[in-house]
Amino acid sequence: MTVPCIPRGLVMADIAAFRLTEEEKQRLLDPAVGGVILFRRNFQNIAQLKELTAEIKALRTPELIIAVDHEGGRVQRFIEGFTRLPAMSTLGEIWDKDGASAAETAAGQVGRVLATELSACGIDLSFTPVLDLDWGNCPVIGNRSFHRNPEAVARLALALQKGLEKGGMKSCGKHFPGHGFVEGDSHLVLPEDGRSLSELEAADLAPFRIMSREGMAAVMPAHVVYPQVDTKPAGFSEIWLKQILRRDIGFKGVIFSDDLTMEGACGAGGIKERARISFEAGCDIVLVCNRPDLVDELREDFRIPDNPALAQRWQYMANTLGSAAAQAVMQTTDFQAAQAFVAGLASPQDTAGGVKVGEAF
């Protein structure tokens, strides 16, 4: 059967279970779609996951980009057969106890193991690292953050990025310009951060600025309002995305929206309005999760905006190692030692607060 040539579109969608239904195949063949995000509900075991990703990639050319939230700690979508990854706060604790060098070495190993294991299963991208500072205010961020110190966050994230690259993956820093100061969970509410731009510049923005300079491939903005800067949430704000992120910081990579079905996004109107505002604000790609009916609504008669850079930006997020090469790496004693080291960093406390961060079973 001839594989249709369909340029990747501007929507990243999801699927319901372990295999594609015929309805999902037709949805993923739509030109509006460019990628698929997987969740815990899509994972039964490694063999099944490999079959699923192969099935998705066989649908069209260029292949759909496959992503997952697989950060470590309480946000690790795939467990059985994968190395249990520590919460990123564990790396911050190493920074405080044993120094920067030891923590950066550990972060590099975590990134390498994380990416290689996913690459072996046909995954292109994990939405990581979290660049939010741990101000002690935000339970949904909490131990997902490396540290409260911007320098520590930036250096540990950069070390993790280098590890990801060894495993064939690019980085995606989130949640721009910082979700750690607010108390609310943007999956459930629309939080507000009342600080000034100068206060944000002095702290939360620093890791994004440094990582942009060091080759961070993608950014995901927060569904948070910063009223002293703009009355719109960052992901819907031209001030944040076009002026501050693109112009002032100089970020050249991909901007993914956070999930447009989250409560923090719903105030912008229906799904077509949310997508339109996201694109006008500067997002390249929008995530629409857990609501296939809304993906279908976007497909029906929504005018997808022209984005000349889209094809190049999508391709930049594709895995660079490949499944077969990653599987070969996993057989080496060096990599197996790295797996053992990383597993030794994880602990039951890493999952404190529950695993269902942005998850739907």
Curated annotation (Swiss-Prot):
The catalytic activity of this protein is classed by the Enzyme Commission as: 3.2.1.52
GO molecular function terms listed in the Swiss-Prot or TrEMBL record = beta-N-acetylhexosaminidase activity
The chemistry this enzyme catalyses reads: Hydrolysis of terminal non-reducing N-acetyl-D-hexosamine residues in N-acetyl-beta-D-hexosaminides
Q: Name one GO cellular component term.
A: cytoplasm
| Annotated localization | Cytoplasm
Q: Name the positions where substrate binds.
A: 69, 77, 144, 174-175
Record: active site: 187, 258
UniProt keywords, alphabetically: Cell cycle, Cell division, Cell shape, Cell wall biogenesis/degradation, Cytoplasm, Glycosidase, Hydrolase, Peptidoglycan synthesis
Principal EC category:
hydrolase
Q: Which InterPro entries match?
A: Beta_hexosaminidase_bac, Glyco_hydro_3_AS, Glyco_hydro_3_N, Glyco_hydro_3_N_sf, Glycoside_hydrolase_SF, NagZ_Beta-hexosaminidase
- Report the Pfam families cross-referenced here: Glyco_hydro_3
Q: Where is this site: Important for catalytic activity?
A: 185
* GO BP annotations, alphabetical order: carbohydrate metabolic process; cell division; cell wall organization; peptidoglycan biosynthetic process; peptidoglycan turnover; regulation of cell shape
Pathway per its UniProt entry is:
Cell wall biogenesis; peptidoglycan recycling
Is Cytoplasm there in the keyword field? yes
Outline what the protein does: Plays a role in peptidoglycan recycling by cleaving the terminal beta-1,4-linked N-acetylglucosamine (GlcNAc) from peptide-linked peptidoglycan fragments, giving rise to free GlcNAc, anhydro-N-acetylmuramic acid and anhydro-N-acetylmuramic acid-linked peptides.
| Family of the protein in this entry | Belongs to the glycosyl hydrolase 3 family. NagZ subfamily.
Instruction: List, alphabetically, the HAMAP family matched.
Output: NagZ
Q: Can you say what this protein is called? A: Beta-hexosaminidase
Source organism (scientific name) = Neisseria meningitidis serogroup C (strain 053442)
Q: Which gene encodes it?
A: nagZ
